[in-house]
């Protein structure tokens, strides 16, 4: 069976404010509505070529809406130093679920939509040495947070929230060639944000 096309609309408004010459802020509000959304309904066992498979049943279940806001602040207190931070809030809910044999609609309606975190945060800083023996050397450090995400429609299974930290070093040569190295997940944090499997 071919899925119906997913339909929806989105509204977003935002503003940028220059508090001082070195400090700026951005704020945005959004609302998203989607119809004919697809959702993993259940896992179902199957056998193919004598091999047992655990497949996901995917179907169109109804409507979801998402609303929230994002705030970003950028600060450059001195030359060649830039810092920024941001926070995002998203309230994404499942609405108007269609009846199906794989899940209870009354247990899923109004629940947080799968794989969308409610809270996110990031902070970033970068500095480049402008004079002396280390002129051209740059360093940047960032950290980010993602709230827990649910793996299913009725919010009975989830991935934990986590923090990640990244570090970067760079050096700019006289010929404007930049060399750099980045270390992602600096503290070797174990985390999960998605689960993949066979679909049916």
Residue ranges and their predicted role:
Residues 2-67, 74-76, 88, 92-98, ...:
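Membrane-embedded beta-barrel scaffold of Gram-negative outer-membrane proteins
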Residues 4, 18, 76-78, 116, ...:
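Surface-exposed coil/turn segments at beta-strand junctions on protein surfaces, enriched
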Residues 13, 71, 167-169:
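Short, basic/aromatic-rich helical patch in the C-terminal catalytic core of site-specific tyrosine
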Residues 31-33, 57-152:
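Gram-negative outer-membrane beta-barrel transporters
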Residues 39-40, 50-54, 83, 97-98, ...:
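Glycine-rich loops and low-complexity Gly/Arg-rich segments
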Residues 44-49, 103-105, 158-162, 198-200:
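Short, low-complexity, polar/charged sequence segments that are solvent-exposed and flexible
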Residues 111-200:
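Conserved C-terminal beta-signal and adjacent last beta-strands/turns
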């Amino acid at each position: 069976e071919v899925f119906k096309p997913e339909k929806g609309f989105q509204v977003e408004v935002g503003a940028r404010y220059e508090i001082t010459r070195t400090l700026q802020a951005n704020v945005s509000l959004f609302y998203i509505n989607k119809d004919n959304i697809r959702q993993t309904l259940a896992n179902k066992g199957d056998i193919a070529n004598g091999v047992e498979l655990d497949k996901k049943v995917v179907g169109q279940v109804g409507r979801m809406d998402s609303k929230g806001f994002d705030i970003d602040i950028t600060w450059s207190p001195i030359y060649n130093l830039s810092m920024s931070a941001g926070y995002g809030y998203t309230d994404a809910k499942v609405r108007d679920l269609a009846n199906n044999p794989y899940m209870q609609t009354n247990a899923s309606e109004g629940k947080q939509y799968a794989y969308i975190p409610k809270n996110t945060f990031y902070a970033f800083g970068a500095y480049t040495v402008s004079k002396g023996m280390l002129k051209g050397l740059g360093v940047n450090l960032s950290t980010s947070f993602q709230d827990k995400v649910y793996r299913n429609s009725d919010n009975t299974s989830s991935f934990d929230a986590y923090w990640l930290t990244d570090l970067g070093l760079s050096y700019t040569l006289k010929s404007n060639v930049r060399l750099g190295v980045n270390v992602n997940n600096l503290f070797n944090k174990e985390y999960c944000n998605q689960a993949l499997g066979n679909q049916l």
